[in-house]
Amino acid sequence: VNRLVDACAQLDYPRDRLQIQVLDDSTDETTAAVRSRAAYWRQRGVQVAVLHRERRHGYKAGALAQGLSLASGEFIAIFDADFVPPPDFLRRTIPLMTRPENRQVAFVQARWGHLNPDYSWLTRCQALALDGHFVVEQAGRQAAGYTFGFNGSAGLWRRACLEDPRVGGWQADTLCEDLDLSYRAQMVGWQGRFLEDVVAPGEIPPQLLAFKRQQFRWAKGSVQVLRKLAPRLWRQPWPLARRLQGLVHLGSYLIHPLLLLLLIVSLPLLLAGADPFWPLAYLSLASVGPPLLYALAQRELHGRRWWRRWAYLPLLTFLGMGLSFSNSRAVWQALTRQDTPFLRTPKFQVRRPGESWQRSLYAVPLDPTIWGELALGGYALITVAVAVTKGQLWSAPFLLLYAAGYGLMVLTGLWQAWQARPGRRTQVHASRSLPRSSPVELTGPVSQPQPPRR
């Protein structure tokens, strides 16, 4: 958090036009540490305020709404606590929002960079996935004129949109308040912009259980937004392609229960003698898409060295299969309207191999889903054995992906849980309940930005 406060205080922007708020819901010594850092910068002429809440009403959305009510700026920049915005962030985003032709632009989303992409195989896989999302998916949606979402951090909002009664401001009825707000804004005529050339690096979770928690929240929140906005989205006077793409975007995590269902029905189908080889052979052509997506993203970012991170695609595939059980639970909870608290993703300020997160008090403990993953991994191996004995060898490689994915989740989860067992936890790097964001309120433009490539 102090790292973020330092970065915001050093943004290249006139200090009389810059107001920094640290939105703090923590319940430990984090508040005192952040207040000390804020006082340090106030003594140097920077407006920094710590807004601490005793009750986490509305979680992140509630904290952002409270911050907005006390802000004076025309524009609101939002950064999660683990991000480090570059000094020129505002000079490259504010002028775009102030151009006369961009009066309807509600928000600007920068590309997420990575502070620790090479920390481990897990962070390399996540970096590969995030690069594909921003460089291909976000850029592609913008180029096609489709609706796209605000990612919750490293972005800039126009206050007029946040206070537009047609939009409704920050709402806490989903776990993805950022995605919810950006879709509601675009459905009443506001627009968004994605700037690939403006990069704000953030920390990638180095712990598998923290990554699972993050994915669970994103999966549940996205489906909550789908359930909330799908009827309204379908009634928009937009081209059919844009409406369909919006529904597919909001429902992207529905793939996980479908993956789980596919595994479960495979064994009964094999025992019944079903042979769906040819239909699946044609459908399998779609599997070419994801490798191309990630290859294009790495080629765009790293040129001739694109293949070095793309080589982690098999591990990323295993992760995706292994997440299907946990994320299916998230989808089910969203569809059945089960409320759960906002569980933040702990970050540990580790950047290079050898730096330790395992002794942090905020390491995520082992959760019961690991036993479900163990059972499903065994089920997948049994299904592979049945496929081989029945001569259905074509299905074995696909089923082995499930076994490898669940096995990876179980073994890595158990190993990291043992490394982070309570007796070894002595260091504190972050707050248990600090919201993901720290907003910066801005009152006006400074200079013109560099033109984005897209």
Regions found by a protein language model. Name each.
Residues 1-10, 62:
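Short, well-formed alpha-helical segments that are part of the catalytic scaffolds
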Residues 3, 196-210:
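Active-site donor/metal-binding and catalytic loop motifs
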Residues 6-56, 98:
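Acidic donor-binding segment of Leloir-type glycosyltransferases
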Residues 26, 80-84, 185:
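The conserved acidic donor/metal-binding loop of glycosyltransferases
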Residues 38-74, 87-175, 180, 186-187, ...:
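Long helical/loop segments within the catalytic core of UDP-sugar-dependent glycosyltransferases
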Residues 182-201:
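Catalytic donor-sugar/metal-binding loop of nucleotide-sugar-dependent glycosyltransferases
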Residues 235-258, 349-381:
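Loop-to-transmembrane boundary segments
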Residues 252-341, 366-436:
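Membrane-embedded multi-pass helical conduit in multi-pass membrane proteins
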